[in-house]
């Protein structure tokens, strides 16, 4: 192939960290050579990742104008695989589902 591979497994779960969270949902996302996988919006997710050059830290936001309760029910999102030929291992914790739904972007909407 002329393209470096971009294939990921993405998860969303409840817990303090990926190591102790129960995975609630998981999808596959392949962006090269074309958007595919079990992700429900593969093309939009790939476009969002390309816009930040695969930098998940730039993709995921924690700032929002949305008002969320202060409940602590942590949500953990992960990305494992390869982006543009480089190994990816990313994990981010949100304090609760409200904050997660606001900050995770299209990539983690599944």
UniProtKB/Swiss-Prot annotation:
Disulfide bonds join 31-46, 68-98. The record marks 70-71 as: Reactive bond. The keyword NAD does not apply. Keywords: Disulfide bond, Protease inhibitor, Secreted, Serine protease inhibitor. GO terms for cellular component: extracellular region. It is found in: Secreted. This is Protease inhibitor SIL-V1/SIL-V4. GO terms for molecular function: serine-type endopeptidase inhibitor activity. Belongs to the protease inhibitor I16 (SSI) family. Homodimer. Gene3D superfamilies: Subtilisin inhibitor-like. Its main location: secreted. Pfam families: SSI (PF00720). The lineage of its organism: Bacteria, Bacillati, Actinomycetota, Actinomycetes, Kitasatosporales. It comes from Streptomyces netropsis.
